[in-house]
Each structure stands twice: as C-alpha cells, then as structure tokens.
C-alpha cells in the first residue's frame, strides 16, 4: 500500500512538473484582453472588480504581485499556471481512485499499471485541452482557481471521505469540503456546483451524514441569489434539522418553539422584505445559534453542525473585504459596495439584470449546439481539422447535405469522445456510486448550466469557459475509457504485446493534442492588448476623457493606468457602466473628475436606467449622460474644460458623429463641424511614430504570423487598418494619389487576406492608370477568397475596362452563383454587354434580376426602355469601414 501511494505521489508530481513547464513556456507575457486586465489592475491596487467582486482572488493576486519575479501581469498570469498544473495533478489522483474503484480490491499488478495509464491520460488530456490550457496561461479567476482547482479538490475530498467512512465513520473531509466551498465563493461560484455531487455521494453512503451536511451544501446552491436568500435557506434548513433533533429529545421543546418563532421572522425578512433590518437579522441569527449551541453541548452531531456553520461563516467572511475596501474609494470600485444595499446588489449581480430559466433567450437547438456542443467538440482535437471543415463547407454550399453531415462529425476529437462514453458505461457497470458521483458533477456543469445560464443566440464572446467543469468531468471518464480499452485488449488478445501497444498509443493522445493546439495557445510575444491600450491612450490631450464601450477597450486601459501609471490624467468613461448611479457618482467625485453637474438625488433617479429627454422621449441613462458630460465640458469658455474623445470601438455616437475628427484609434469631439473628419498630422504621427504593434505587425508593417491572434484580437486590430484607409482617402481627396496608394499598400501588407482593404486598393490602382496591377491584385484575390462575390465582381469590372468582355462575364457569373442577390454583378454584366453592343444578352441579365427582384425600380425601368446605364461603383466612394468588434 505504501509503495502504491508513493508511486501515485511521484506520478502526480511528474504531471505537475510537465504541465507547469508547458504553461510557463506559453504564459502570456503581459495583459490579455477580456477580464484579465481588470483582475490584474484590481490585484495590484486592491480594487473591486465587476460583480460579484471576487474578493479572495484579489487578495491572492495582491500577494502574487509582491513576489519579485518578472512583471506584475506575469506574476498574476502565473497564478493561473500554477493552480492549473496542481489541478492536473489532482485530476490524475482522482482518476486513479476512480479506476481502482472500477477494478475493485482484487486487482492485479497489470490492472494497477493500467489504472495509472488511464488516470495519466485523462489528466494530460485535461491539461492540454482547448479551454483549460487557454485559461491556464492568463489571469483568469473563473477557471484555474475558482472552478477547476476547487472542484477537483472537493471531488478528491469526497472520495477520501467515502474511503475513510467505510473503515470508520468520520466527518473531517466533509467539514473541509464545507470550508473549501465557502471560501472559494470569494473567487467564483463554480466551487459551489460541487455541492450537488457531494450531496449525492453522502446521501448514498450515509443518509444521516447527508441530513447533517444538508444546510451548508444546499445553501451553497442559492448563493447567486444574494445574502438574504442565503440567510433564509440557512434558517429553513437549520430549523428542519432542529425539529428532527427536538423529536429525539436533544433540544428543549420550548427552545424549539422560540427558535421557530424567530425563524419565521427571519424567513419573512429574508424572502419578503427588501432589506434586513438590524432587529430581524438579530432574531434570525439567534433562531439558528441558540438551538445549535444547545445541540452542540449534548451530541456529536450538534458539534459537527456547529463547526460546519462556523466554517461556512469563516469561508464567506472574505466578502467583508468588499465594503471595507469600497469605503476607501479605490480607483477601480465596481458597484461601490460601501453600503448594505449596494453590497447586496453586487452579490446578487443586479447590474446584469434578472436571470430566468424561462422564457428561453434562444432556441434549445441554438443553446445545445452553438453554445455547448460547438465548444465541447473542440476540446480534444488530436490533429488539425481545418481541411475537413473546409470540405464540409463546400459540400454544404453545393447542397450535398449528407457529406456535409459526415464532415460535421468531430473526427479530430472522435477518439477521446468515444473513450469518454466507454468510460462512463464501464464505470456505471462496475461502481454505481462512483458513476452517480461523477455523473452528477458532469450533469450540473453541462445540462444544469445550459438551463441556468440561458444563453442568447448573440453572446458577445465564446462562452466555452462556463462549461470547463463539464470538460473536466468528461476527462475523468476518458481516463476510465482508456483503462477499460487496455483491459479489454488484454483480455481478448493472445499476444502480450498488443495491450502494451494499445496503452502506448492511448497514452500518446495528450502529445498529439498538445502538438495540435500549441500555436493557438502559445502567448509568447503577444502584447496585442497591452499595445492596443497604449495606442489608444498615448495621443490623447492632457486631462481629457475618452468614452469606451466594453471590456476590451476598457480593462486594458485600466491596467495601463493603474499598474503602469500611464496617462493617469485621462479618465476612461465606460458607456456600459454609465447606466449606473454609483459609476456616475465616481466620475463626478473621484479624480480625474469628469464635468458632471448633478446632485446625488438626480443621479439616483438616473440609476433607474432610462430618463426623459428635452422632447419627453425616454432615452437610456448613458445617452443622457454622454450629452450632459460633453455639454458640461464646453460651458463658460471658448475651449473645452476637458477634451472629450470616443474610442473607435464605440458603435453608438449619440448624435456627435458630425463633430468627430479621427485621431488614430479615437475620435476627437470638436465644438463644431468645421474641423473635418480626419486630422492628418495627428493620425499619421500616431500611426508611424507613437503606436506600438508588438505581436501584430513586423518591423516592415506586415502581419506577424509567428504570434497567434484570436478572432477578437484580429478584429480589434483592423481599427489600425481603418485609420490607414481614412488617411488614404484623405490623400486621394487632396490629389495625392501616390501617398494614398502607399497607405493602401501598407494596409494590404498588414492584412493580406482582408478583402475590404484589397478591393479599394485595386480601385486606387485603376484611378492611377495601373490596370495591370489592379488585374493582378483581383486575380489573386479570387484565388485567395474563392467564396467572396465582391472579389469576382471587382475582377470582372477591371477585365471589362480592359476590354476582355467574355472573361469579365465569367467573373460576373461566378459572383452571381455565389450570391444570387448581389445586384452589382447583374448590373456589371449588363453594363459590359450594353457598352459592347450586345443589347439582347445585356437585357437577359436584367430580366434574370427582375424575375427574382420585381420591386427594383431601376431594373424595371431598364427593362421597359431597353436601354440605360446602371449605377457603377467608384473608388471615390467613402472607404468601407472594417467590421467592428462585438463588445459587451
């Protein structure tokens, strides 16, 4: 037994070492996008991040910032790496216990080694899975600490309690579970999901213990409802347990009657009053503590219950950080939980609105496939599946739905997925209790979350991280499936070498997985978020303010200001938060202040979300506040009190767009509309002399292929292209076509596959008289973008200009084939044929178009007259704006 324990410990240590090395090699060197910027900044300054405040993570992060190692963001990012590596090691140990339970006590030496191989494979497949690896190398509170580490520790403690309980009844591991769950709520609620599996396990093994621990475990499930509902749950569950012990004579009946009266008062205050009063809170507390104290003096069960209640309170006490720190007004103080009402609102996440199971915000098909299965299937690709996906897209476009369905099968991850199913079936047959334990964990972290979270079909970002616990549980089943397959091979095969070969092949899966996902999970050299924030702040006027939209144009800026002390004179005004009263008060009162001339009562009214404007129409609070702030900035002087800006990522401009002048990544708001839409000097200086592009572009301005950029980073980076495009069109309007072409060519180097840039560049070549360059560009574009109808249309138009009508028609026909509603292709074909005297063929295209679009007045007029010239796009039109990122 000692040798087995030593072997398991050594293998677990090896798992930790290997995984930690990989994570530290691929660790993000600076601030990433999304929540990481906020968490790094809050850890550094002891701030309060977005609801529910995650106080324990901030405190742990603050300790990490004090370690003299590399930079502050690397220290916080390393927290995720360390805890994720520990999680992988614990996953191996849990998997080993589960496989041993499946084999039974009478397993032989080969089965013991099979258990090690299965557990090791499952743990490493978790470590190098898509979502787990991605969150392990960035400052992320949800996954590494608050969910995966806490959950696998709780899962292990539950198994440890079960193992010890069979020898001698004990409550120690369960009491530790209570503390771990309740303290980890200060990081994320994910740890609380383990309450259900623990209830299932304890109820199966020992019903008396289940009744004893029902209060701390069940109460954990209502934590998202806030303090009052939690208090109500504690009162109800405790009262029910006290009644049981009263009937057994362990609690005085009169004490129970008094406790029941107090419990009724407490429940009414918890569930029906808007806030606790001091009196009702005291009565509710007494209704629980007095009977519990009496019970603790008379029985072991009472002492266990009292200790569990104490551990709940101690664990949850990390939330006391929130009002204490909020009262000191840190620079980042989301929700400002300095009062009871605001603290409760923060813990209940009222800022995000009420969450309901029904009605569903999207169809079940969307929620199951797009918001779950799409993420689940991409966790364990053993080889790149891009070729299969592209082939499936071609089959679907060609109407071959059968082959498209075949391509939709997750071939790259098929082996791990099938092994997980096999492991689940094998565990269900061999040990029903362990199956229900792991299965309930998987169920609540997949189906339960789908029901609870109720995602819409337009989520602002990939939500794969919410289901990380489900992937985790499934990896345990994959490990079981590996052990089952090796054992079955051993049982059925005559040759001893066959199960060895199978074991080696299965154990190699994590290596193939790591190889497949290495590039997309290697953050070395990735400074995109850091430099994007720097580039937005650097050119701003002193003591100005900038309106931003969501996480990715706000949190990195907060990081730059609070951690690197860069441009702290600038106030970042987040439009999403500008709908809340506490944020408006902070903008008014905390430096650097924003011009706001409203008292507290007026601001509280604005906090309701809508306000009537001058015409009596209701508008959103943030729209009202933007106008109020800008108007307050220009009162009493010919110049701005503070210069306002809008980030280019802001989609709604509140009517100020005519007064915008582009300056790099921001729009400067002018006092009138006379300044023009572009400041060429400022923008050019910013683009060429100020901005940093590490990880985005190489020294020659071309796209850096060595650093992976996800869809969000790639989309945000196109705002640099937008600035260059505006410069190019500015030069064209000034008659400086050569400089305009130079700008366009620079953008083409920056984004070689961005058709919204390449097509206008071809137009610039045409205007410059360089038809050969335009033809070469468009021909290459049709090869690189074979499904883009605009590429074929542009190529056809250029061929027609050259006089190659028949070849031009082939391009127009291809554009029509790709997009039957693309009117420009029809008109282009008509124009070419009509100009070359082929009127009948020209009218054929118009008839074809009118058949499908009878309401097109221009086409009908051409059809009736038999002649005419259609509209023709010109490169002198306004430049197309690159797609803007979808920010929350």
Indicate where each model-derived feature is located.
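Transmembrane-helix motifs of polytopic, lipid-linked glycan transferases
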Residues: 13, 78-108, 150-157, 418-423
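Extracytoplasmic catalytic/substrate-binding loops of multi-pass membrane glycan-assembly enzymes
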Residues: 27-39, 49-60, 74, 142, ...
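Loop-to-helix entry region of an early transmembrane alpha helix in multi-pass inner-membrane enzymes
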Residues: 55, 59, 67-89, 93-94, ...
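ER/secretory pathway lumenal C-terminal domains and tails of membrane proteins involved
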Residues: 104, 132, 137-148, 160-176, ...
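Short helix- or helix-capping micro-motifs
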Residues: 119-127, 181, 185
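TPR/Sel1-like alpha-solenoid repeat signature
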Residues: 724-727, 731, 743, 758-765, ...
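Register position in tetratricopeptide repeats
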Residues: 733, 767-768, 801-802, 835, ...
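TPR/TPR-like (Sel1-like) alpha-helical repeat modules
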Residues: 817, 830-857
